[in-house]
Amino acid sequence: MLYWAIVCLVIAVIAGILGFGGIAGTAAGFAKILFFVFLVLLVVSLVVNALRGKGPKV
């Protein structure tokens, strides 16, 4: 039980450092960019599969 308490403490300290250190804003901006990149890749993949006449695998 002490092991899990220490693990939770370490995770909380790391989250606090990242949250109050300004890295969170940078990571959020990076995540937004990645979201739109992968959204475009999804649309391209769907269009290519539709043009080839292949349906989605079930």
Curated annotation (Swiss-Prot):
TM region(s), chain numbering: 4-24, 28-48
Disulfides per UniProt: none
Entry keywords, A to Z: Cell membrane, Membrane, Transmembrane, Transmembrane helix
Location within or outside the cell: Cell membrane
Membrane topology: Multi-pass membrane protein
A Gene Ontology term for the protein's cellular component: plasma membrane
NCBIfam families for the chain: PRK13682.1-1 (NF010226), PRK13682.1-3 (NF010228), PRK13682.1-4 (NF010229)
HAMAP family reported in the protein's UniProt record: UPF0391
Family (UniProt): Belongs to the UPF0391 family.
Protein name: UPF0391 membrane protein Maqu_2901
